[in-house]
């Protein structure tokens, strides 16, 4: 498994092209699987089940339609994105549901390292915390699979400007809010967070 970590924001369309090419390379056995850590410039993305009324304004940031599952979400500075390109066929114990659950376990264990208690919700896909008596999402999931190769992945709010979510109904869920590590009192940089992400990834996927 190769790891690629970007130091500067990656344009969204460039990232999509890169992932599609990498998926083909993995399927053809000419390239290795990849975990790609990055952030994007501010933007909204619409998944395959997004509804037009969930986009409250299109004047804040660019809006991209994407082939991943899910609804509207935000990407931008302060949000660590992990795009995971993995061959599920090469893992006898892995199927799509187990893959998504294992992604959830990965993020939960990463957050636990920073003393954040969280949980993966299979019904409201993502990782959630109970903050001041209310449930808030801290990590969103958007997955696509082609030729049994996964791509897209997980976005975790590290020090994200949460006001940027105001132009959408995040993931189509009105009842609950969004939070970040910074909002929860954990002030860290990507460098520290990435070390833990990689360590916990290797643990949870080692038997998969």
From Swiss-Prot:
Q: In which pathway does it act?
A: Protein modification; protein lipoylation via endogenous pathway; protein N(6)-(lipoyl)lysine from octanoyl-[acyl-carrier-protein]: step 1/2
Q: Domain (BPL/LPL catalytic): give its ranges.
A: 29-208
Please, which domain of life does this record's source organism belong to? Bacteria
GO MF entry, a single one: lipoyl(octanoyl) transferase activity
Reactions performed catalytically: octanoyl-[ACP] + L-lysyl-[protein] = N(6)-octanoyl-L-lysyl-[protein] + holo-[ACP] + H(+)
Where on this chain does substrate bind? Answer: 68-75, 140-142, 153-155
User: What are the annotated GO cellular component locations?
Assistant: cytoplasm
Location in or out of the cell: Cytoplasm
Q: Where are the transmembrane segments?
A: none
**PROSITE patterns (UniProt xref):** BPL_LPL_CATALYTIC, LIPB
Q: Where is this site: Lowers pKa of active site Cys?
A: 137
Its Enzyme Commission number(s) read 2.3.1.181
UniProt KW keywords: Acyltransferase, Cytoplasm, Transferase
Q: List the disulfide bonds.
A: none
Residues annotated as catalytic: 171
Looking up Pfam families in the UniProt record yields: LplA-B_cat (PF21948)
Per the record, the GO terms for biological process are: protein modification process
Family recorded in the similarity comment: Belongs to the LipB family.
Q: Which PANTHER family match?
A: LIPOYLTRANSFERASE 2, MITOCHONDRIAL-RELATED, OCTANOYLTRANSFERASE
Describe its function: Catalyzes the transfer of endogenously produced octanoic acid from octanoyl-acyl-carrier-protein onto the lipoyl domains of lipoate-dependent enzymes. Lipoyl-ACP can also act as a substrate although octanoyl-ACP is likely to be the physiological substrate.
UniProt miscellaneous comment: In the reaction, the free carboxyl group of octanoic acid is attached via an amide linkage to the epsilon-amino group of a specific lysine residue of lipoyl domains of lipoate-dependent enzymes.
The protein depicted here goes by the name: Octanoyltransferase
Species of origin reads Ehrlichia ruminantium (strain Gardel)
Q: State which gene encodes it.
A: lipB
């Amino acid at each position: 498994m190769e790891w690629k970590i970007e130091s500067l924001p990656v344009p969204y369309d460039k990232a999509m092209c890169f992932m599609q090419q990498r998926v083909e390379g993995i399927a053809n056995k000419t390239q290795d699987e990849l975990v790609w850590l990055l952030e994007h410039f501010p933007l909204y993305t619409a998944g395959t089940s997004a509804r037009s009324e969930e986009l409250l304004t299109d004047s804040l940031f660019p809006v991209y339609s994407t082939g991943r599952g899910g609804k509207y979400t935000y990407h931008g500075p302060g949000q660590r994105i992990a795009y995971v390109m993995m061959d599920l066929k090469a893992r006898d114990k892995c199927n799509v549901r187990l893959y998504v659950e294992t992604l959830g376990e990965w993020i939960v264990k990463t957050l636990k390292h920073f003393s954040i208690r969280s949980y993966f919700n299979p019904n409201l896909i993502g990782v959630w915390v109970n903050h001041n008596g209310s449930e808030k999402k801290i990590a969103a999931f958007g997955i696509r699979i082609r030729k049994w190769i996964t791509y897209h992945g997980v976005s975790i709010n590290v020090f994200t400007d949460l006001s940027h979510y105001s132009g959408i109904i995040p993931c189509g869920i009105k009842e609950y809010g969004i939070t970040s590590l910074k909002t929860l009192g954990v002030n860290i940089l990507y460098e520290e967070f990435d070390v833990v992400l990689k360590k916990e990834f290797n643990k949870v996927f080692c038997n998969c």
